[in-house]
Amino acid sequence: MLKTFGVAGAALGVGSVLSNPLLGASHSKPSGKNNSNPWIYAFNIGDVEAWSISDGFLDIRAGLSIMYPESERGQMKQLLEQHSEQTDSLHMYINILVLRRDKEVIVFDAGFGIVDNPNRGWLIEGLETIGIKRADVTAAFLSHTHGDHIAGFIAPDETPMFPNAAIYTTPEEHKFWMQTSHDFSRTKRDPNALVRLVEAAQMRLELLKGQIEHTPAGTKLFGGLVTVEDAFGHSPGHAMYRIESAGESLLNITDIAHNDLIMFRNPSWVIGWDHDMGQAVDTRRRVFKQAAQQKTPVFGFHVPWPGLGSIVPRGSGESYDWAPRRLFWA
């Protein structure tokens, strides 16, 4: 069994404190990144340098109304209250995994891009902080085409954010969004929002067509450093990634979980944004069970920054805890 990754890094914080008019009353405090709130964490996976860079966060004011089954929202609310979490909105982190090996620089998803919002769009500044320019990025992975993952691949002038990078995505994901008809019968998304989602996905994929390469599940790249794995459900071709180097590993579960309490405690609790809710639940059960049994170190896109941890079983059933990894400063 591959052992846990080594941590040899530091947390960094820079920038100003700005307010966000979109936040609810419970979030009226100044927000944004600052020196008292670290947003870059350095570690390593075997021989590979790695960073978790926060691209910011979202507060979903719809709260538990986007979680299903509707009949079990009371249990979800009770769980949040037990952990002193707010119940009128859901806080989602945006964690970007970055790897560097020699001249290879690899980014996993790209966040929101450069936007006029103090609470998101931090990735490019984060890369510059650790000495990586946009042109230095040689490869990137697009787990799926939702805006918080794909928008950051496009600069404000509609040119590639990372002009020298190949962008790897599954053929299932690319084909679904670029086709002329779409089956959304297994999602709870608002139909009007789906129209905008398709338009945005097609526009962005068209702009990136010169960089996109199809990588089916099972594809190994960079001499086995990264393996693309099937995580279908949240989107038609949703992918996750296994990183392996010098006997150490990390599983990037991308959007399999959107909350570190709700979806781990009961993997059948599902967010209405999932494309195929039943398939998303099956994927989550499979991945959580395997990761827990194998004690695999995990990286999550939406769990609390820096997104590093492990999945720990609760008893003998299908219930788990998200166990954040201890942070180290070298």
Indicate where each model-derived feature is located.
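Divalent metal-coordination and catalytic microenvironments
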Residues: 47, 99, 109, 137, ...
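C-terminal segment of N-terminal export signals and the immediately downstream linker at the start
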Residues: 17-52
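Active-site metal-binding motif and surrounding structural segment of the metallo-beta-lactamase
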Residues: 89, 118-168
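Cap/insert and terminal regions of metallo-dependent hydrolase folds
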Residues: 242, 246-330
